[in-house]
């Protein structure tokens, strides 16, 4: 018999994108998730609509999550990164159809200013936002995404001048 903690292993990953958005000072945008009581900071991310390219999805998600798409893509990750969500969350997310996400990540230079950011969108995901340093980023991220974030930071850190 299968261990109940492994009952979701046959589920696929949801295809998505993640954005490491940099301001002019090379600080990274993070938002505090609105749907949890614990302090869950993360970089913007979201799903890919069928027929959409990852780069188009990244710019669309940026607009949907931070209320602005003022920026341009500096780099795209060389591979897809994936993470599993904790098993207790699976039934609550994506109708229980996915075990986690596989994401293409984008390093984006934000060309707007703080006044251009509006997290109070039609479907808000964040209730707070801030700019953080590369050094602080990994310490404030929700633990189940930390390994993915470490890989993304490793790939992009040489491009953050």
From Swiss-Prot:
Keywords noted in UniProt: Hydrolase, Magnesium, Zinc
Pfam families: NUDIX
UniProt-listed InterPro entries: NUDIX_hydrolase-like_dom_sf (IPR015797), NUDIX_hydrolase_CS (IPR020084), NUDIX_hydrolase_dom (IPR000086), RppH (IPR022927)
Keyword Disulfide bond annotated: no
Free-text comment on the cofactor: Manganese cannot be used.
Documented EC number(s): 3.6.1.-
Cofactor needs: Mg(2+); Zn(2+)
Protein family according to the UniProt entry: Belongs to the Nudix hydrolase family. RppH subfamily.
Binding partners and assembly: Monomer.
Protein's name according to its UniProt entry: RNA pyrophosphohydrolase
Species annotation: Rickettsia prowazekii (strain Madrid E)
Name of encoding gene: rppH
